[in-house]
Amino acid sequence: MMIASSLAVLYGIAIVSSMGVQSARADYADDCTTPDGDQGQCMPFSSCRTIEERLTEAQKAGQKVPADYASYLQKALCGEFNGVRHFCCPSANIQHNSKVMSLFKDENFDCGNFLSQRVSNGYEVKLSSRPWMALLRYQQFGESRFLCGGAMISERYILTAAHCVHGLQNDLYEIRLGEHRISTEEDCRQQGRKKKCAPPVVNVGIEKHLIHEKYDARHIMHDIALLKLNRSVPFQKHIKPICLPITDELKEKAEQISTYFVTGWGTTENGSSSDVLLQANVPLQPRSACSQAYRRAVPLSQLCVGGGDLQDSCKGDSGGPLQAPAQYLGEYAPKMVEFGIVSQGVVTCGQISLPGLYTNVGEYVQWITDTMASNGL
């Protein structure tokens, strides 16, 4: 019997006793107390090492879950989100979903490959050199417009900001991939006497809008979302995923990089400011700089970046990637990694020279992998 089938039987038991105070109040990743009295978080079973291992052992042995452990799980049940039952998992046992991590670590998963170039602020990037860039298209007041950006992270998922999706699910209907110059049907560059052109752009619909459960628009917290495409988009020369900071080493590196890149068409709630894909350098700032600028504490879930040059932030897309090259899973050549997401309050072109707050992607890899696993790869 498959683990999922065994769990289905177990869940039937657990539902009866899941009306406790903890299960009634818990949300994804909420703090909770395990039946053993340990501090934990409300997580899907596949993200809890001890629970997954125990159930896997039972499955391999062809046994039912022991009655005492079934009772433990009944008490640990803390909620159901996206059709998946969650359990209070000890903090030390929380793990990234193994299926999604296998996808990201597969040797054929060609993420973060980029063409290097010397970049001055506001310069056009080379054709197809940032193949993960995505444009989000909205239908508003009878007009179709690109109002946000994002980054491709798999054949079915785009990573963007929650503020680009929240309250706009009925307007946001399509993703464009493989774009360079918006106004031209075909994107080409002259190389000597030869003209090299990129394949056509791909426009694809959206199956699911997945916003972080704790997104707080007022305080710009947990500003992260996933868009599940309505079909897989095969990787091509001009359409490939960016890498994510999926290891502790990469997560820590976010605080060590001195200069990041923002890439985009300057797409914001007011439209696009550039017809062609641009890139600019933005410096990492201490969180104290943003604390002073925004008069509040800046948590680890956000990065403080930019300031100085008034035009720096104009090149990025709202919801687009804050990126930098880094060593990825032991590979020799650096890969481009998305360390941050352009959040609200960042794209303030020509206004006061303030650093911006970016969503720290490394703090949300758990959420990304859990959400992808719950909604289908």
Curated annotation (Swiss-Prot):
Binding positions (Ca(2+)): 179, 181, 184, 187
Pfam families reported for this sequence: CLIP, Trypsin
SUPFAM superfamilies to which the protein is assigned, alphabetical: Trypsin-like serine proteases (SSF50494)
InterPro entries for the chain: CLIP, CLIP_sf, Peptidase_S1_PA, Peptidase_S1_PA_chymotrypsin, Peptidase_S1A, Ser/Thr_Proteases_Immune/Dev, Trypsin_dom, TRYPSIN_HIS
Biological process annotations from GO: defense response to fungus; defense response to Gram-positive bacterium; innate immune response; positive regulation of antibacterial peptide biosynthetic process; positive regulation of antifungal peptide production; proteolysis; Toll receptor ligand protein activation cascade
Annotated GO CC locations: extracellular region; extracellular space
Localisation: Secreted
Record-linked CDD domains: Tryp_SPc (cd00190)
Alphabetical keyword list: Calcium, Disulfide bond, Glycoprotein, Hydrolase, Immunity, Innate immunity, Metal-binding, Protease, Secreted, Serine protease, Signal, Zymogen
Principal localisation: secreted
Disulfide bonds: 32-88, 42-78, 48-89, 111-243, 148-164, 188-197, 290-304, 314-349
GO MF, any single term: serine-type endopeptidase activity
EC number: 3.4.21.-
Positions annotated as glycosylated: 230, 270
Residue positions of the active site: 163 (charge relay system), 223 (charge relay system), 318 (charge relay system)
Recorded family membership: Belongs to the peptidase S1 family. CLIP subfamily.
Domain notes: The clip domain consists of 35-55 residues which are 'knitted' together usually by 3 conserved disulfide bonds forming a clip-like compact structure.
Name of the protein: Serine protease grass
Organism: Drosophila melanogaster
